[in-house]
């Protein structure tokens, strides 16, 4: 990339370069000049492309503290104006769109004014603004800064899916030899963190086992970990306890019964696609008969059940996707999460190929909408990613009262997170001003060997971060 940027005021060049790479790649070998002018109560951006020998202007009223870094945002928007590019999400890229709307509301906008800014300034379409508003209204009913959430990462899977970029290692691969020591280290970390939380000012409101595939844990280890958790964590304020039991090839009825015994009330059962050829291509084993058995038993045990599907898997056609969607009628699920595949650099899929079939966006969205209406579900959380396919958002739908609090808190980065296990990211969220949060993070090693070796040191450093929260707030 040989993009050259010139401006008459200081801006974040790296941010503009990344925006150009994803949203305006025609300009990557160009020389771009931005002239930023402030006139009365307006900000004006004049942008010129040397390669295209074109220029344009974008001006907007100075919004003050209602948005973060208006000049930088306007520089990015002016590039879309220069190329006459139209996206459903306008200039919003790789961000949590609902946080943009929530900030506008925090800083004094009503929904009418916020919609105008999203449409006229950020260039978002009415359809996506409607989605944002629906999600934010539900989130505002459930967001809670007065508690924390607990995340436990199990970095093992039966096989590594090619699209996956998460902390995960094949249980039967070389790293699998650290499994037993990992479990022992996790039990120790639960004890250490539990002791600290007894002195911490905020109680836990949600618990989430992720990974990896947490249900890769052997039955006896699953019981040991869950028992240790309940022995050391105050459950009095816990509203939900989720276990990401995503793969049927890691599950049996006994494991479901153990989860239920130790207060897990939500699980995910994630086919991702019902097309067996697709699942083979991405190295994901799937037995439909066992999946249906597990689903049936989970319903008997009265778990709240989420199901994940991915749109845009390699070589999947519109017909393949519609076939998967049509089969949802056979499952009485409480949540449905639709992911649009984003090629992550850490995934094998990114390294092997970036080719995907063209699919009929409008037809697929129409079918999704029909399904969620039939199941009495509404969107309750969403997020976007870079490198995502054309229309680009991941949406969680839920029946009323079955929303995942953890998902909302994590996407909105509203609540402190204490993370244990492999790859877990702990967060301290400090609300500074005008809806802008300062977030301090601490990352557990995703590599099991490193996690085991550095457990004591890492626990000490992580707890020290939480102890500093009072200093940052003062």
Where are these regions (language model features)?
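Conserved non-cysteine loop/helix-boundary elements of the Radical SAM core domain that shape
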Residues: 168-367
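TRNA-binding/sensing appendages of the translation machinery
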Residues: 362-384
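Short, conserved phosphate-binding/catalytic loop or strand-edge motifs used
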Residues: 94-99, 133-136, 167
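N-terminal [4Fe-4S]-dependent radical SAM core
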Residues: 79-86, 106-151
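Radical SAM enzyme core and accessory elements
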Residues: 1-107, 400-474
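A general alpha-helix detector
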Residues: 96-100, 104, 113, 117, ...
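Flexible glycine/acidic-rich beta-alpha junction loops that bind and position SAM and/or redox cofactors
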Residues: 277, 281-282, 311-318, 334-358, ...
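Canonical Radical SAM [4Fe-4S] cluster-binding loop centered on the CxxxCxxC motif
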Residues: 147-183
């Amino acid at each position: 990339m040989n993009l050259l940027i010139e401006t008459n005021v200081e801006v974040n060049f790296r941010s503009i370069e990344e925006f150009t790479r994803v949203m305006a790649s025609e300009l990557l070998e160009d020389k771009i000049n931005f002239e930023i002018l402030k006139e009365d109560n307006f900000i004006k951006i004049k942008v010129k492309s040397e390669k295209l020998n074109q220029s344009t202007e974008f001006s907007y009223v100075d919004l003050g503290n209602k948005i973060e870094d208006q000049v930088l945002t306007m520089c990015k928007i002016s590039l879309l104006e220069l190329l006459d590019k139209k996206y459903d999400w306008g200039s919003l890229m790789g961000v949590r769109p609902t946080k943009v709307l929530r900030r506008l509301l925090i800083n004094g906008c009503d929904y009418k004014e916020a919609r105008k800014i999203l449409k006229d300034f950020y260039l978002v379409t009415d359809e996506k603004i409607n989605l944002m508003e629906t999600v934010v209204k539900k989130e505002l009913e459930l967001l809670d800064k007065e508690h924390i959430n607990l995340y436990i990462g199990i970095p093992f899977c039966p096989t590594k899916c090619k699209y996956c970029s998460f902390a995960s290692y094949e249980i039967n691969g070389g790293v699998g030899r650290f499994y037993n020591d990992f479990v022992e280290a996790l039990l120790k970390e639960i004890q250490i963190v539990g002791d600290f939380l007894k002195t911490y000012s905020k109680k836990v409101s949600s618990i989430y086992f992720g990974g990896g595939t947490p249900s890769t844990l052997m039955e006896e280890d699953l019981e040991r970990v869950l028992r240790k958790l309940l022995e050391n964590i105050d459950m009095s304020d816990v509203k939900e306890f989720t276990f990401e039991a995503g793969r049927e090839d890691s599950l049996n009825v006994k494991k479901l019964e153990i989860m239920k015994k130790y207060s897990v009330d939500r699980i995910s059962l994630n086919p991702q696609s019902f097309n067996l050829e697709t699942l083979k291509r991405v190295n994901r084993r799937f037995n439909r008969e066992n999946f249906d058995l597990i689903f049936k038993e989970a319903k008997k045990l009265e778990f709240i059940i989420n199901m994940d599907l991915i749109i845009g898997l390699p070589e999947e056609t519109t017909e393949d996707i519609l076939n998967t969607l049509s089969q949802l009628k056979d499952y009485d699920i409480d949540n449905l999460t639709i992911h649009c595949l984003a090629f992550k650099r850490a995934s094998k899929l990114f390294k092997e190929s970036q080719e995907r079939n063209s699919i009929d966006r409008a037809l697929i969205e129409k079918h999704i909408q029909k399904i969620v209406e039939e199941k009495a579900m509404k969107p309750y959380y969403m997020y976007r990613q870079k490198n995502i396919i054309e229309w680009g958002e991941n949406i969680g739908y839920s029946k009323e009262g079955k929303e995942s609090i953890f998902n909302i808190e994590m996407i909105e980065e509203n609540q402190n997170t204490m993370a244990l296990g492999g790859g877990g990211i702990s967060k301290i969220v400090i609300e500074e001003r005008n809806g802008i949060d300062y977030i301090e993070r601490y990352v557990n090693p995703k590599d099991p060997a490193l996690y085991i070796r550095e457990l004591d040191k890492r626990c000490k450093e992580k707890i020290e971060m939480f102890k500093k929260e009072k200093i940052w707030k003062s």
